[in-house]
């Protein structure tokens, strides 16, 4: 029985989707004004892992993740580079797709762009005005936050404290235009030569919060199963999404709110962020390291907990991947000489370990405990491989289970390419040298192959090779 921690209720709840066998899932995507950093990638990876596990459990997942392609940051960045906002968006949407592909993040069912939904955004705001939840002032439109009785509930915010904070951090001119300091913008009037669209209130552009309300309800319906995002989005973004959406539809907006923890760096575990300047972009990092190692590191901690990023932890993730790949390679290597049949004791133990994996993951996607079972499955496989005689069905079963569970973490090992003619010739030459007991030459050829990234291993079952 799958349980998830619901931020709205601050407790674990049994997961029951609106439609049996199908999950509607919306995850806030990036504001595409720059390359994503590792902290941004953590959110994408965490919810991709959750999605993959739901699919493993037999659910069809309708997964929508948006692109925020117009807001203050977009305008500022476009002006700095002397290009248009759409040009900036196109550049970094392409970069995002390249980065997430390298991290083996499954493409979303839909990746809507805010600017493709302006007509729906305007209609949504008009509906809120008609219901007296919003009001227009000099081309801007604001939401009456206090009118929504549950405002502040998601993030546990007190309205009086919010009023004081809003008054301290909002420009005096804007505060005077608002009916209440905690009201927030749904539509922003055009300023200067900013990108803008026609609306009943004059030319302008949407506020950030309204974009996600419109896109999630448009593509997934008035009520969705799971809404995900980083913990920094709880307030005000997700709080405002609830207020907007439920005021318009009169329905529960989201049944389960899931929020991932931050990526931290340094001895003081400081949150990684662009504003603090302590970030590393995925684009730069994957030029230097195996993207799969970064993916595995980001997948190895339960999604609600913070993850510390460091080069040593990244190297540890790569070591763990190498060991798992070696296990799978060894299972494949023994297959041609395996006897027919199966070892029922080993098969039963493997089934128990996969069942324990499911139990762990069913507890709010507890990947740490899940990985413990996966490593035990790899250990069982290695112990079985030590036997002089192995059975083909058992090898296949072990490899299939390992591959299936690793895929939940986005780990898919590519088959080694065939050796080219030159390397094949060197291997034959080495075998001839060994037969002639010319071990110095044999070792020299081995070292030459190693320099080309080919590792030779002499085993009781014969010589085998693998790429370093």
UniProtKB/Swiss-Prot annotation:
Give the residue ranges of motif 'HIGH' region. 30-40
EC no. given is 6.1.1.16
Q: Where in the cell is it found?
A: Cytoplasm
Question: Principal localization?
Answer: cytoplasm
Molecular function terms from GO: ATP binding; cysteine-tRNA ligase activity; zinc ion binding
User: What GO terms in the biological process aspect are recorded for it?
Assistant: cysteinyl-tRNA aminoacylation
Alphabetic keyword roster: Aminoacyl-tRNA synthetase, ATP-binding, Cytoplasm, Ligase, Metal-binding, Nucleotide-binding, Protein biosynthesis, Zinc
Give the signal sequence positions.
none
* Names of required cofactors: Zn(2+)
Where along the chain is ATP bound?
A: 274
**Catalytic reaction list:** tRNA(Cys) + L-cysteine + ATP = L-cysteinyl-tRNA(Cys) + AMP + diphosphate
Broad class of enzyme this protein falls into: ligase
| Residues reported to bind Zn(2+) | 28, 212, 237, 241
Cofactor: binding details = Binds 1 zinc ion per subunit.
Question: Motif 'KMSKS' region at which residues?
Answer: 271-275
A GO-annotated cellular component:
cytosol
The record's family statement is: Belongs to the class-I aminoacyl-tRNA synthetase family.
Q: Which NCBIfam families match?
A: cysS
Assembly, in brief, is: Monomer.
Q: What is this protein called in UniProt? A: Cysteine--tRNA ligase
Which species does the entry assign this protein to? Latilactobacillus sakei subsp. sakei (strain 23K) (Lactobacillus sakei subsp. sakei)
């Amino acid at each position: 029985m799958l349980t998830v921690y619901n931020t709205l209720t601050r407790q674990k709840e049994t997961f029951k989707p609106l439609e049996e066998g199908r999950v509607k899932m919306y995850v806030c995507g990036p504001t595409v004004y720059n390359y994503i950093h590792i902290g941004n990638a953590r959110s994408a990876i965490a919810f991709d892992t959750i999605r993959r596990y739901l699919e493993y459990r037999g659910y069809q997942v309708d997964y929508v993740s948006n692109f925020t392609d117009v807001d203050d940051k977009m305008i500022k960045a476009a002006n700095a580079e002397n290009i248009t906002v759409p040009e900036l968006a196109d550049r970094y949407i392409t970069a995002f797709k390249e980065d997430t592909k390298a991290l083996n993040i499954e493409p979303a069912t839909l990746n809507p762009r805010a600017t493709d939904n302006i007509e729906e955004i305007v209609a949504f705001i008009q509906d809120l005005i008609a219901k007296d939840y919003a009001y227009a002032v000099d081309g801007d439109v604001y939401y009456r936050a206090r009118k929504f009785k549950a405002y502040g509930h998601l993030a546990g915010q007190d309205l009086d404290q919010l009023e004081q904070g809003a008054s301290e951090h909002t420009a005096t001119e804007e505060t005077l235009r608002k009916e209440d300091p905690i009201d927030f913008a749904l539509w922003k009037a055009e300023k200067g030569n900013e990108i803008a669209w026609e609306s009943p209130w004059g030319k302008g552009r949407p506020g950030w919060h309204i974009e996600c309300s419109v896109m999630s309800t448009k593509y997934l319906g008035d009520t969705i199963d799971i809404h995900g995002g980083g913990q920094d989005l709880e307030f005000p973004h997700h709080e405002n999404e609830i207020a907007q959406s439920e005021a318009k539809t009169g329905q529960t907006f989201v049944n389960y709110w899931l929020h991932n923890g931050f990526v931290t760096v340094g001895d003081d575990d400081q949150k990684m962020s662009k504003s603090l300047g302590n970030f590393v972009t995925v684009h730069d990092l994957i030029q230097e390291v195996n993207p799969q190692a970064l993916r595995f590191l980001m997948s190895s901690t339960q999604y609600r907990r913070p993850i510390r990023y460091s080069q040593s932890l990244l190297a540890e993730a790569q070591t763990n991947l190498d060991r798992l790949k070696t296990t799978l390679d060894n299972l494949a290597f023994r297959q041609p000489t395996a006897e027919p049949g199966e070892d029922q004791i080993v098969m039963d133990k493997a089934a128990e370990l996969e069942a324990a994996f499911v139990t762990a993951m069913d507890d709010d996607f507890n990947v740490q405990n899940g990985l413990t079972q996966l490593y035990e499955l790899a250990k069982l496989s290695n112990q079985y491989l030590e036997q002089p005689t192995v059975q083909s069905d058992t090898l296949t079963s072990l490899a299939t289970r390992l591959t299936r569970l690793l895929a939940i973490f986005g780990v898919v090992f590519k088959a080694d390419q065939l050796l080219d003619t030159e390397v094949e010739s060197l291997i034959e030459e080495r075998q001839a040298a060994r037969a002639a007991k010319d071990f110095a030459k044999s070792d020299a050829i081995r070292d030459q192959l190693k320099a080309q990234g080919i590792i030779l291993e002499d085993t009781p079952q014969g010589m085998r090779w693998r790429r370093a």
